[in-house]
Structures are given as C-alpha cells and as structure tokens.
Amino acid sequence: MSEYRRYYIKGGTWFFTVNLRNRRSQLLTTQYQMLRHAIIKVKRDRPFEINAWVVLPEHMHCIWTLPEGDDDFSSRWREIKKQFTHACGLKNIWQPRFWEHAIRNTKDYRHHVDYIYINPVKHGWVKQVSDWPFSTFHRDVARGLYPIDWAGDVTDFSAGERIIS
C-alpha cells in the first residue's frame, strides 16, 4: 500500500472535501453556527481567503487561497475540526483525512466553484442552487458573479473532485 503524500504550494489555491465519519449525519447543517464560528476563529488566527464554500449535512466542499509564503492548510483543517467537535461536545466525528486538489488555472477554478455551488442540487437537497442557505453562492450573487437563477432545476451536472486531464 502506498503512503499518501500531500502536495503543498505556498500561497496556493485549493479545493477541499471534508466528510463526517457518519455519512447519514446532518450535524454540519443542524450545528451550522458552531461550524461557522470555528471557521471564523481559525481564519482570524491563521488567515486564508474563502473563495467558495458549501456545507451539506455530512460533508463540505470549499476553495481556499492561502497567504503568500504559507502552505499549511492541514493545521487549519485540524483546528477547524477540533473547534467544531469541542463546541458540539462530541468525539471522533470526522473522517481522519480530507481530500485536496491544487487549483491549476482559471478553468479549473471555475469548474470547482461551479461544482461546489451545484452540490446541494446534485445530492437532492434542493431543486435550485439559490435555495440552499449554507453556501457562499449568495455572497457571489451579491457580488454580481452569478445570477440568482444560475443552474436552476439542473438535475444532471457532470463534475467532481477529481479531474483527469
């Protein structure tokens, strides 16, 4: 069995998928404010830019850009997981790792942001992207980056974490 090695780029932009251990849980959305508080605290102590984020009941996808000269996303994730777990008064709720993908170019970035925003529709939680409250989609609509009806009623969106090129 090969040993997994993470790829680090100082100041890089990354797509992440982070899962709860119990894939039937709804903890991330029922305790969304606790999760949000954990993210804000870690971001205040160890800054990073949130490019896009969606929180689903048992997993989340996001894109971060780290500060110039900084490649340590792992300790930020460790701290977010720790803060949230402690706030919920639970133990052992996360899958041990997370999945990351270094964003390579503008096309790759756009593809992953679209994937993040369509994810609640893909999983059947809502019919339209704008109906999902746990997403930076609404921020990006306010900024004029997406129309409010973007991807409305899309039922088959072909995208994912892994892109082979």
Curated annotation (Swiss-Prot):
GO terms for molecular function: bubble DNA binding; DNA binding; DNA hairpin binding; sequence-specific DNA binding; single-stranded DNA binding; single-stranded DNA endodeoxyribonuclease activity; transposase activity. Signal peptide: none annotated. GO terms for biological process: DNA recombination; DNA transposition. Cleavage occurs in the presence of magnesium, but is much more pronounced with manganese. InterPro entries: RAYT_transposase, Transposase_17, Transposase_17_sf. Keywords: DNA-binding, Manganese, Transposable element, Transposition. SUPFAM superfamilies: Transposase IS200-like. Belongs to the transposase 17 family. RAYT subfamily. Monomer. Transposase that is always flanked by repeated extragenic palindrome (REP) sequences, which are clustered in structures called bacterial interspersed mosaic elements (BIMEs). RayT catalyzes cleavage and recombination of BIMEs. Binds REP sequences and cleaves BIMEs both upstream and downstream of the REP sequence. Could be important in the creation of BIME variability and amplification. This is REP-associated tyrosine transposase.
